[in-house]
Amino acid sequence: MDQTRTLGKTKLKVKRIGFGANAVGGHNLFPNLNDETGKDLVRTALDGGVNFIDTAFIYGLGRSEELIGEVVQERGVRNELIIATKGAHKEVDGSIELDNSREFLRSEVEKSLKRLKTDYIDLYYVHFPDGKTPLAEVAGTLKELKDEGKIKAIGASNLDYQQLQDFNADGYLEVFQAEYSLIQRDAEKELLPYCEKQGISFIPYFPLASGLLTGKFTQDTVFDDFRKDKPQFQGETFIHNLKKVDKLKAVAEEKQADTAHVALAWLLTRPAIDAIIPGAKRPEQLQDNLKTLNIELTEDEVNFISDIFK
């Protein structure tokens, strides 16, 4: 498959397999994370030819950005990378609140620039809507930052269909991020078609449905993290999903490939999806994700896989 793509209407050229860096410094998301292991993940990504790194303030409340900034500075490769980060969260009296105000987002971008040790951010997303600030106004704030050269492209994440249209009222939106995988296909109803029509690049998160599409789980698998609260990992739904994954596994075996690679390769055949950003907690997982680029799916295989998960 094509190794690189331009993200939608932007001038950002990315390798189609990026790196979702929530396990780099994301101590508030995962137990027992080690900063040096996190930095090794970034180094492994760079060594593997990854040029698209996705992070956010909420990943360790800025720690992920700091660790990425340290490695990028150490390697001297800033100009070769596309770095995406996100903002909207703030700490207030020990709790996390959302803020999309102009003053807050401008301040957050400045803080992200410092943490990442850079003078520009390639792609900046509003991570979540705050439910108060008009979304066209939020997009306008990012347009100001783009015009000033602080960010190169405008992104938004976690919007419903109406919110997506509101954010893009002036046509400023360039990249949109939402949950999408073979297991979770709600985006196909309205979000993906809208992005395709508008020339907006769609970046799916949870592309492996939080590991469900790796084929490594059984009915006896016990989850002790956020997955235990997700419906797709519970009761009959979980068993039903495992049966579908078994069918996907059979397709992968025919192609002498891993189940996860086939699931990711399927995503890269979808309209508007220029790149994906699977996460990893260990360097070997990250190296493994890169093997997806070796998978070629025929049209019949793409349709067969789609039908399994209808």
UniProtKB/Swiss-Prot annotation:
- GO CC annotations, alphabetized: cytosol
One Pfam match, by short name? Aldo_ket_red
What are the EC numbers? 1.-.-.-
Q: So where's the catalytic machinery, residue-wise?
A: 59 (proton donor)
Molecular function per GO: oxidoreductase activity
Keywords in alphabetical order: NADP, Oxidoreductase
Source species, domain of life: Bacteria
Residues engaged in binding NADP(+) = 206-216
> What family is it from?
Belongs to the aldo/keto reductase family. Aldo/keto reductase 2 subfamily.
Instruction: State the name under which the record lists this protein.
Output: Uncharacterized oxidoreductase YccK
